Curated annotation (Swiss-Prot):
It comes from the Bacteria. The active site is at E355, H386, K514. InterPro entries: G6P_Isomerase (IPR001672), G6P_Isomerase_C (IPR023096), Phosphoglucose_isomerase_CS (IPR018189), SIS_dom_sf (IPR046348), SIS_PGI_1 (IPR035476), SIS_PGI_2 (IPR035482). It comes from Desulfatibacillum aliphaticivorans. The keyword Metal-binding does not apply. HAMAP family: G6P_isomerase (MF_00473). One of its GO terms (biological process) is glycolytic process. This is Glucose-6-phosphate isomerase. Catalyzes the reversible isomerization of glucose-6-phosphate to fructose-6-phosphate. It catalyses: alpha-D-glucose 6-phosphate = beta-D-fructose 6-phosphate. Belongs to the GPI family. Pathway: Carbohydrate biosynthesis; gluconeogenesis; Carbohydrate degradation; glycolysis; D-glyceraldehyde 3-phosphate and glycerone phosphate from D-glucose: step 2/4. Keywords: Cytoplasm, Gluconeogenesis, Glycolysis, Isomerase. The gene is pgi. It is found in: Cytoplasm.
Length: 549
């Protein structure tokens, strides 16, 4: 990929000057000056409408941001990803999660080999297997059908399937339950096992290498629990499958290698829900809905690859994010879905964004002198309104926020959905407009307040407004729409990493803690005091040993 220091581009210099010109302007004025601002600052793809008009941008801002994308060679970098070049250079890998959802017969090459036959073969394996689980054809060791699927994984092997199965609960097969165990804290597996019957439970062990410490610790605990009831180790093969590539370790565990679902090193963990890692999704909502998820993502892939940048949803969202991150010095972004089914959506992209773009070294190995990935967080509306929106409205920090909502609810009970959506629309309007001192004064006078009372309370009721938001409105939360939304954010993250000149597809920062944990674990088995670390770590370990007795 092209390596361009963004702050040394002509576009960046123009953006710095433009920021000085625009930083104190209010969005209220932008709307007054342009009655067609909504039309000019919104884009659509299928059933998804993205309104970015409530941002502190003008046509000039977008023009300069688009110049940055062109000057940095973004088009070429997009093509490099889709064509299978090794853009994950620190691990010498292609980045081809987009191949997993590709529709059609065109080849996709990785290291000169068309990966699509293997992708289709695993998808067919998933289709057949999930069908056998759902229809009850697959029997447990006592001849009973499977009712509960437990996915044991961590990170990308957990967060994606958790988020998607929560989002797609309305599509769940009526007799299927799905559970997820990720944390190595024994509480997670213990509380999950309490809910299960070993005769009707299927465990999916999601680990590419079949050596991931947290996952395999939980897997062996699950196997021991199962064998307490089943007795014979031969029954493991009816109740455990593997999402892995380590055939030898899978068979040693007791899993039939015919029930090993493969994925490849060009699939990053946080982009793996589209692969065999999505088997729990297919078993929960049916392969036909998993396929719709893939088709929705593919539609966004085509849009991202083909549309001009000025009409390209992921590109525009990424550029607006850079505008706030690098020029307004915003530290965080909020993702606020007004749909309870999407309650894990912010957490999923917390990993997707922060693990991808939480980097401080550029693609040449030099320390960056510009801000990179933001902190991502969020909760569903309207809960967040009664928790943290106060700071977004009146705090000292700028927090750009994405508001997402479906026009149609899966649960159209009474007035619930209209009340929910009235809050969705009201919040972005309030964040944009705010409330001036004159408006507050008029309101208080109408309420019969005395002048001295007004003087005392007025400053506290003023909202500056000018708080930026994107509104993402879609017809209904279907598998296809969800696939498009996920791919939209994936590509936004890619664009930002590309323009910041960092590697978005490795995660070396995760490794050091893992290495140290392996050194510390044997020390916790020994009763002797520890003195091999810094004073704080020694003190904490020794205090732990004392508390353990």
């Amino acid at each position: 990929m092209k390596k361009t220091n963004p702050v040394k581009t002509r576009a960046w210099l123009f953006l710095e000057k433009h920021y000085e010109d625009i930083k104190n302007r209010h969005m209220r004025d932008f709307f007054k000056e342009d009655p067609r601002r909504f039309d000019n600052f919104s884009l659509a793809l299928d059933d998804i409408l993205v309104d970015f008009s409530k941002n502190r941008i003008t046509t000039k801002t977008l023009e300069l941001l688009l110049n940055l994308a062109h000057e940095a060679g973004l088009k070429e970098m997009i093509n490099s990803m889709f064509s299978g070049e090794h853009i994950n250079e620190t691990e010498n890998r292609a980045v081809l999660h987009t191949a997993l959802r590709r529709q059609g017969d065109e080849p996709v090459l990785a290291d000169g080999k068309d990966v699509m036959p293997d992708v289709r073969a695993v998808l067919e394996q998933m289709r057949v297997f999930s069908g056998r689980i759902i229809t009850g054809e697959w029997k447990g060791f006592t001849g009973k059908a499977i009712t509960d699927v437990v996915n044991i994984g961590i990170g990308g092997s957990d967060l994606g399937p958790v988020m998607v199965t929560e989002c797609l609960k309305p599509y769940a097969k009526p007799h299927m339950n799905v559970h997820f165990v990720s944390n190595v804290d024994g509480t997670h597996i213990a509380e999950t096992l309490k809910l299960l019957n070993p005769e009707t439970t299927l465990f999916m062990i999601a680990s590419k290498t079949f050596t991931t410490q947290e996952t395999m610790t939980n897997a062996y605990t699950a196997r021991a629990w199962f064998l307490e009831k089943a007795g014979d180790k031969k029954h493991v093969a009816r109740h455990f499958v593997a999402l892995s590539t380590n055939k030898e370790a899978v068979e040693e565990f007791g899993i039939d290698s015919q029930n090993m679902f493969e994925f490849w090193d060009w699939v990053g963990g946080r982009y793996s829900l589209w692969s065999a890692i999505g088997l729990s999704i297919a078993c929960y909502v049916g392969f036909e809905n998993f396929h719709e998820l893939l088709k929705g993502a593919y539609a966004m892939d085509v849009h991202f690859q083909k549309e001009p940048f000025e009409r390209n949803i992921p590109v525009i969202l990424a550029l607006i994010g850079i505008w706030y991150n690098n020029f307004f010095n915003a530290q965080t972004e909020a993702i606020l879905p007004y749909d309870q089914y999407m309650h894990r959506f912010p957490a999923y992209f917390q990993q997707g964004n922060m693990e991808s773009n939480g980097k401080s070294v550029d693609r040449d190995g030099n320390p960056v002198t510009w801000q990179t990935g933001p902190i991502i967080w969020g909760e569903p509306g309207t809960n967040g309104q009664h928790a943290f929106y106060q700071l977004i409205h009146q705090g000292t920090k700028m927090i750009p926020a994405d508001f997402l909502a479906p026009a149609q609810s899966h649960n159209p009970i009474g007035e619930h959905h209209k009340i929910l959506l009235s809050n969705f629309f009201a919040q972005t309007e309030a964040l944009m407009n705010g409330k001036t001192a004159a408006e507050v004064q008029k309101e208080l006078e109408a309420a019969g307040k005395l002048p001295e009372e007004i003087a005392e309370i007025l400053p506290h009721k003023v909202f500056d407004g000018n708080r930026p938001t994107n509104s993402i409105l879609f017809k209904k939360l279907t598998p296809r729409t969800l696939g498009s939304l996920i791919a939209m954010y994936e590509h936004k993250i890619f664009v930002q990493g590309a323009l910041w000149n960092i590697y978005s597809f490795d995660q070396w920062g995760v490794e050091l803690g893992k290495q140290l944990a392996k050194k510390i674990l044997p020390e916790l088995e020994d009763e002797r005091p520890v003195n091999s670390h810094d004073a704080s770590t020694n003190g904490l370990i020794n205090a732990f040993k004392h508390m353990m007795g």
